């Protein structure tokens, strides 16, 4: 009986040695190292701090034009959003938001309303710069030029969709350097699945720290087969 036991133990040791030789991975337990994230990649319990940093600097932009059939009254032709870039009142928006405007109105989140001056625009990038004369200080968007957007980064789209009022949607950067969207214009878009709708154009796309990543520009309304795509928006 004792001999049989020794024989079984010996066989077990031999089999174990063969397995260790054939499969080195069994010699030790592999440990997984947790990936290191920077502060912009960490997932917070709430994005409210980022919203509070960025949202006050995102404004509503109204393109008003003369209606000759209504006794030349100014009426809202298109609407969009804009981003206050500095304390002097310079605002960036999309050119298509203010095209052919007879008057441009900017509404701040604190209730102040201003008539804006068009400083300049660029068809290639679909960007325009507005200027308002405001007293009492202006909120400005946080900017970090060292922060490079990466695929998978959490982003927030801030704007005024359908004139509902300021709205925040959340998603990730789905792609960078997207091309082929505008044959005559800029060919380097950020793609995101954060909801971007009519009225979001010119608004801010910010990271989880509230820092400006891009200017919301367009979304797919319909695909070539007539379907309405979801979760496909673009920012400059």
Spell out what each predicted region is.
Residues 3-12, 16, 20-236:
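Serine-dependent protease modules
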